[in-house]
């Protein structure tokens, strides 16, 4: 296999003169391409972390067998709500920990619920089967994303107490660090 490599010297090149205050990514998205525009840079009152200490927003979503499940249906003392995306690398990296967490607390008053925020039912069913998920996996909707203030980002972990008050919000996943943070929050509430 041959390779052609050409090298040229460039001097005083200006590639991008656009300033951040005038830049809008949606100017570069093809016309007709479906997009969602969230309030980037909006005041922090819209952030998920500001839900700590507040009642968790209620939802009714379908599980992978297309049966409705509501937050109010869950009677466990502690609930971990994981807002996830099946195309999200960090979300996939968290799966072994979440499966172990479900096994570890199976005799405790604990429930783990993952809410998929990016795809739809057929994809969820295949994903849950392929990943051998041992916890509840629900088909999310835009209202959950809005109510939980994730802005479409994933993963998020919301730890709820028996009164369904959000006691801790964790954004992102870092193996080891996030595992410890979630486990400590659950232990504190059990």
Pin down the residues of each PLM region.
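Generic structural signal for well-ordered beta-strand positions
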Residues: 69-70, 167
């Amino acid at each position: 296999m041959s390779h052609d490599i050409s090298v040229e010297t460039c001097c005083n090149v200006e590639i991008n003169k656009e300033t951040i205050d005038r830049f809008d990514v949606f100017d570069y998205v093809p016309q007709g391409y479906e997009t969602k525009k969230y309030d980037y840079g909006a005041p922090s009152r819209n952030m998920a972390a500001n839900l700590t200490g507040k009642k968790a927003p209620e939802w009714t979503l379908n599980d992978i067998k297309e049966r409705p499940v509501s937050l109010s249906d869950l009677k466990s003392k502690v609930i971990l709500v994981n807002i996830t995306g099946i195309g999200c690398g960090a979300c996939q990296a968290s799966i072994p920990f979440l499966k172990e967490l479900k096994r570890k607390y199976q005799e405790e008053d604990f429930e783990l619920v993952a809410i998929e925020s990016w795809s739809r039912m057929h994809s969820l069913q295949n994903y849950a089967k392929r990943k051998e998920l041992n916890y509840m996996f629900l088909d999310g909707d835009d209202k959950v994303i809005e109510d939980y203030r994730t802005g479409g980002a994933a993963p998020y972990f919301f730890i709820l107490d028996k009164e369904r008050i959000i006691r801790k919000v964790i954004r992102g996943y870092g193996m080891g660090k996030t595992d410890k943070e979630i486990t400590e929050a659950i232990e504190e509430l059990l």
